[in-house]
A protein has these predicted regions:
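Short beta->alpha transition motifs characteristic of CBS
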Residues: 39-49
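A structural motif shared across PLP-dependent enzymes of the aminotransferase-like
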Residues: 34, 61-64, 146
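Immediate flanking context of iron-sulfur cluster ligation sites
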Residues: 77-89
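Zinc-dependent deaminase
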Residues: 1-20, 91, 100-171
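A short, polar/charged loop-to-alpha-helix boundary motif
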Residues: 48-65
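Glycine/small-residue-rich phosphate/adenosyl-binding loop
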Residues: 41, 64-74
């Protein structure tokens, strides 16, 4: 069940997604939170603008992937297993695998892979990999989402990204 604290972290992830969009990247944001509800690390999509805003495009700079990498280098096995990743969009297959290989815990997301695929179809946008859900990649992982009230905002970000036409969000 998604709690009020979960929603707070998801709102931060959505804010990071908006930051990514404003910077010129696809709108995705993620937050890594410890078992005692402390925000450990945040990131946004940087696939176009580069790790340091240097413009060196890197298709692996998804926020879920960079948080998994950060956690692997900075947290113990136990800390990683007890952590939660909050994200504006369900992990892709690459990020799901990184999450599992690094031994991270629960994932809570705003919009699902299924939703993203429907939105992409609406605008004729493709993807280079199969649209797998997290649990298709990591069957035993605890995953919660989508969160419809926030997914509407994320949808608007994607529309703006794909069309260049912004919609005014009330959230």
């Amino acid at each position: 069940m998604i709690s009020d604290q979960d929603l707070e972290h998801l709102r931060l992830a959505v804010s990071l997604a908006h930051e990514a969009l404003k910077a010129g990247d696809a709108p995705f944001g993620s937050v890594l939170v410890s078992s005692d509800n402390k925000v450990l690390q945040t990131d946004r999509n940087r696939t176009v603008t580069g790790a340091n805003g240097d413009g060196r495009a890197d298709a692996t700079l998804h926020p879920e992937f960079t948080l998994a990498r950060w956690a692997q280098l900075n947290l113990s096995d136990e800390e990683r297993a007890k952590s939660t990743v909050y994200t504006s969009g369900e992990h892709c297959a690459m990020c799901s695998a990184a999450h599992a290989w690094c031994g991270l815990g629960r994932i809570v997301y705003v919009s699902s892979t299924q939703q993203l695929e429907a939105w992409k179809a609406e605008f004729g946008v493709g993807a280079p990999v199969a649209p797998l859900s997290i649990n298709q990649v990591v069957p035993e992982l605890t995953v919660e989402g989508p969160v419809e009230e926030l997914a509407k905002v994320v949808y608007q970000f994607h529309v703006e990204n794909w069309t260049g036409k912004g919609f005014k969000s009330k959230s």
